Each structure stands twice: as structure tokens, then as C-alpha cells.
Amino acid sequence: MRLLFAVTATAVALAVVAAGCGSTGRSGTTPSSSTAAATTTAAGALQAEANATVAGDIPDNQVFLTFRNSQAGYSMKYPEGWAQQGSGGVVTFRDKNNAVRAIVSSGAAWTKAAVQADAQALKGARVQGQPQAFTLSGRPAFKVVYQTVSAPNPVTGKRVTLTVDRYYLWKQGRRAVLDLGCPLGVDNVDAYRLISESFRWN
């Protein structure tokens, strides 16, 4: 299974679905997702290429490695064995119908208005609720959750619906959008919380 990502030319840099991929049940650090919603201001909605079966549960014993992006100036964890695509400002990791994408660029700090505008501009995505402000690993952030549907599989006609948690992050003239997507109904909360909380600016 292969995940495809559409990114607009101005890529820069998340409310609520009944069990968003990267939502956390904890209060105080990462907000919990309880309805579907959202994405970023220069990156299009995360897209999946439909496969015959929907798979995506990340095993409890999954090993995570640290990805260091010296060009974009950040590091984050990702599941060992996932395929990496891209470099610099746009990097994705994918496996089956799961996908994690980081988009980094220069720009002012994200505001609620800017996040709302970004989410409203997303094509091919269904966003619900308002951006949620919270603290991620000690730094301010916003989160939006959205759903996006793949094109039909050319053989089976099957479509895959992804639930995507989108995080908006920033620091000193740089900003990032972090998308974590998985098939609707798949519970990757713990793994995606680990990934989102591991993001560090250099």
C-alpha cells in the first residue's frame, strides 16, 4: 500500500473525531481527538491510495528511530521500517495506510486565525470543529483533525478514509505542519502521541 501526498507550492510549515489516529486520552499535554477534523496552510490534505484491504494498526512493540533533519532544523521519532520520502522542508514516512508528514518553512508564528484559514483552504478534506490550542512538549501549538478519502482502487473500486491529526508548530521564524494519518477506525493513539511529542526544533 502506498500513500501519496499532495503539497501546494506555498507549503509552510489540528477538534475532534471519535478516536483520531494521534489523539491522546490525556488532558493537559496533547488534546484528545473526539471528532474528525483538519490540516495545514501550504500542504494539501494527506491522501491515501486505496488498497484491497485496510490495515494500519501499529503494534505495541513497534521500535522507533530518531530522524534528524539538518536542512529543516528539527528531529522527530518515526516507526522503524517505514519508508521515507522527500527531504529538506517536506518529509513523509509511510507504511500500509499509515502516514506521517512534516512540512517546515520560514514564517511567522501560527495564530488561531491563520490555522482556521489554512484548514478552510484544504481541498479533499472534511474538517470539523475549531483549532485547538494546547501545549506540546512544553511549547505552544494548535491541532486540527480532518478526514480525507482516497481515489477508488482501479481494480476493486474501494476507497480508504483517513483520519488525520494535524499539528501546527513554530519557533523563531520557522513553522511546521505535522500530519499523522491512519485509516478510519484504526487506533494508533499511543504511537502517534509518541511521534508528535518527540518533535524538537534544533
Over which residues does each language-model region extend?
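N-terminal targeting sequences that direct proteins away from the cytosol to non-cytosolic compartments
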Residues: 2-98, 171-174, 179-202
